[in-house]
Amino acid sequence: MYIPLKVTTDYSLLKSLIKIPNLINFLTCNNISACGICDDNLYGVFDFYFNCKSNNIKPIIGLNAQIFAKDIYLYAMNYQGFLNLLKINTLIEKNILDIEKLKEYKDNILMILPFSSLDLLNDVSFEPKLYLGYHTEEEKIKCLEITDNSVYVENIKVLNPEDLKYLKYLDLIRKEEPLNYTSNYYYDYKFIDKEKIKEVVSFLNVEIPLD
């Protein structure tokens, strides 16, 4: 199994069925050595971080932000990057995040721009650590035509494939059109470049001080 970079947890209200304790158990049982959560807030970070540390799993801390209603995934490269994520999260809560404010806190942040948000590529080109994210083979081909910095990212919202059918009810509660959830998130597709995932993971090293 590959290292997941974009797990959405139930801290993202009505967007996921994944609870932190269940996620940690899944990672442990499947010998997955690192994992990234990337919610639309940072409320679950400490729960996730310390549970990972207690189980010898490398915690990767991300934040799913939006610019012009397009998703961008922001990851802390170190503790300073984590502090910048906290500042960005505050801007999100105040509904005042824009490109210029994002530039102010770009240091020590790695950004993954999902394929669905490629329209933002020119706007976010200021980011020194920028990757494009794909989740199909066709998207991978198109991303690689732009840059070698392209990495597999699947927005994981369930741990068991049989639970996929329940996600549509969360969509309905949020009064959104239900999506067709058919992916087997943890199947190792041949087109996944695991080495590129490891490269990204190697940049993300947050240590949160206890004092």
Which sequence ranges carry the predicted segments?
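Conserved active-site carboxylates
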Residues: 1-11, 19-35, 57-62, 66-133, ...
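Active-site-adjacent beta->alpha loops and helix N-cap segments on the catalytic face
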Residues: 18-20, 41-51, 137-144
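Active-site glycine-centered loops adjacent to acidic/histidine catalytic or metal-binding residues
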Residues: 39, 155
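Generic short alpha-helical segment signal, independent of protein family or function
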Residues: 50-53, 90
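Helix C-cap/helix->beta junction micro-motif
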Residues: 55-57, 146-148
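Non-cysteine beta-strand/loop elements that form the S-adenosyl-L-methionine
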Residues: 63, 151-154
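Charged catalytic and DNA/RNA-contacting regions of genome-maintenance
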Residues: 143, 151, 158
